[in-house]
Design a protein with these regions (language model features):
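Repeated scaffold domains used in trafficking and secretory/extracellular systems
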Residues: 1, 36-46, 79-88, 118-129, ...
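Residue position within the beta-strands of beta-propeller blades
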Residues: 3-6, 50-53, 91-95, 132-134, ...
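Short glycine/acidic-enriched loop and turn motifs that connect beta-strands
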Residues: 7-12, 54-58, 97-99, 136-140, ...
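A short loop-to-beta-strand structural motif that recurs across blades of beta-propeller domains
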Residues: 17-19, 60-62, 100-102, 142-144, ...
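Short loop/turn segments that connect beta-strands within beta-propeller blades
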Residues: 22-26, 64-69, 105-109, 146-151, ...
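A short beta-strand motif characteristic of beta-propeller blades
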Residues: 27-33, 69-76, 110-116, 152-158, ...
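Solenoidal tandem-repeat scaffolds enriched in leucines and small polar residues
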Residues: 82-146
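Hydrophilic extracytoplasmic domains
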Residues: 181, 198, 204-209, 213-219, ...
Length: 299
């Protein structure tokens, strides 16, 4: 069973829906639709869906049951919450009003700020009580870690470039990438994208490879691929060894910003964003044998 957000143009605006596919071959079922705003990040916990949404210009976190009924907001519009991520009994969301990352329980209670004000929307990952995030200032990028139990912030890595991004966090393993630019004087003439794996416990860094553009870490594995869809797997137990190489059925989505994630973990599977027809995006879900499980298009 697969849930996803669909955005459909009606001629006067977009209508957002949470849809479900019960089997790879089945038609999509519209579970919940809003005509007043957007639907963004979401997760499913027990018998309810929790999601970021809006009513006109007011943004909030709401919830609805799996039948699309009993919908209600769990944060006030005044919080102006962006993003909806779950970890260890807490929902994490960025409050644009407070300009702070916050967390709260699934009923909206125990609302509290998380870490420093420098943690911005969309630039953090959460695992094992750690919030790992990046900060770019004055030509540098710093990767930091806030521990939600100790309430402490540690600096993990610092780079003399703003072309550094975090890509995923699984357990105590952080995947990040850095663009190593080649210059002649002050002019950039080329460069190489490099992925790295960092162990939060030991501080060990592993260089994983060059010229890959997308990657994620999940299910004790590391996935990397290039623009043409040439992919590889590595194990977290020995990240320097490529355990499998294969070709994706489609090249990754083109003409997209660096901050957009084209590869996402979906349970034990991976989902890839590829080019569809016209302005559509084709989503391909692949299972553990690295064969296509299902695909669908979204606007």
């Amino acid at each position: 069973m697969l849930y996803y957000v669909q955005m459909k143009w009606t001629g006067s605006g977009y209508v957002y829906s949470i849809c479900r596919k019960d089997t790879p071959a089945s038609d999509a079922v519209c579970v919940y639709t809003t005509n007043t705003g957007f639907i963004g990040d979401f997760f499913i916990l027990q018998d309810r869906i929790y999601f970021a949404t809006s009513v006109d210009k007011d943004r909030m976190i709401s919830t609805v049951d799996l039948n699309g009924e009993n919908a209600y907001a769990i944060t006030a519009c005044s919080r102006d919450c962006i993003g909806c991520y779950y970890s260890n009994g807490w929902i994490y969301s960025y409050s644009a009003k407070d300009d702070r990352l916050a967390r709260f329980r699934t009923d909206g209670s125990q609302y509290e700020w998380v870490g420093e004000a420098e943690i911005k929307s969309g630039w953090y990952y959460i695992s094992n009580g750690n919030v790992v995030y990046s900060v770019s200032n004055d030509g540098t990028t710093t990767i930091k870690c806030f521990n939600t139990e100790k309430k402490t912030t540690d600096t993990l890595k610092t780079f003399d470039t703003t072309s550094a991004w975090i890509n995923g966090l699984y357990g105590n393993h952080l995947l990040y990438e850095v663009y190593d630019a080649k210059k002649e004087g002050d002019v950039v003439t080329g460069g190489t994208m490099r992925f790295y794996l960092y162990n939060l416990n030991s501080g060990t860094d592993y260089t994983l490879g060059n010229d890959k553009i997308e990657g994620t870490v999940w299910n004790d594995q590391i996935f990397l691929c290039d623009k043409a869809g040439n992919a590889e797997l590595r194990s977290l137990q020995d990240p320097m060894i490529v355990t499998k190489e294969f070709k994706l059925p489609n090249a990754l989505l083109g003409n997209i910003s660096t901050s957009a994630r084209l590869v996402l973990a979906v349970g034990k599977n991976l989902a890839f964003a590829t080019d569809g027809e016209g302005s559509q995006v084709k989503i391909i879900l692949m299972y553990s044998e690295w064969k296509e499980l299902t695909s669908f298009t979204v606007n």
